[in-house]
Amino acid sequence: MKVLIISAVLFITIFSNISAEIEDDFLEDESFEAEDIIPFFENEQARSCIPKHEECTNDKHNCCRKGLFKLKCQCSTFDDESGQPTERCACGRPMGHQAIETGLNIFRGLFKGKKKNKKTKG
């Protein structure tokens, strides 16, 4: 029995030393420095969505979601001070999406009104 306990303790000691060395080697190989992390955060900030009525001229596919649908980048052409046509875009809700959401809100309001009436009757 003593031999079994001594060999178990010896095995655990050797195993813990080996795993500690492997972990140290892994951390040295995969170490992250500030220069490695900064570009990651810059990319994350660039991917944040563009809210409603904000300009999306340079990033037309990155408008936020509002309600049921994602906002669309809607563009218009204007003449600048020099008379050259320039395109300006802003995130907005298309009329079709706006009509659908308004209709659904009215429809939901009808059912909420019926539930309130049932509660007041009983």
Swiss-Prot record:
Keywords: Amidation, Calcium channel impairing toxin, Cytolysis, Disulfide bond, Ion channel impairing toxin, Knottin, Membrane, Neurotoxin, Secreted, Signal, Target cell membrane, Target membrane, Toxin, Voltage-gated calcium channel impairing toxin
Annotated region (Predicted alpha-helix), positions in chain: 99-112
BP GO annotations: killing of cells of another organism
Disulfide cross-links: C49-C64, C56-C73, C63-C91, C75-C89
Gene Ontology MF terms in the entry: calcium channel regulator activity; toxin activity
Signal sequence coordinates: 1-20
Top-level taxon of the source organism: Eukaryota
Primary location group: secreted
Residues recorded as bearing Arginine amide in the entry: R108
GO cellular-component term (any): other organism cell membrane
Compartments reported by the entry: Secreted; Target cell membrane
Tissue: Expressed by the venom gland.
Statement: the UniProt record of this protein carries the keyword Signal: yes
Modification sites for Lysine amide: K121
Residue ranges of the propeptide: 21-47
Domain remark in the UniProt entry: The presence of a 'disulfide through disulfide knot' structurally defines this protein as a knottin.
Complex formation: Monomer. Interacts with CSTX-13 (AC P83919) (Kd=430 nM), but does not interact with CSTX-9 (AC P58604).
Protein name: Toxin CSTX-1
Organism: Cupiennius salei (American wandering spider)
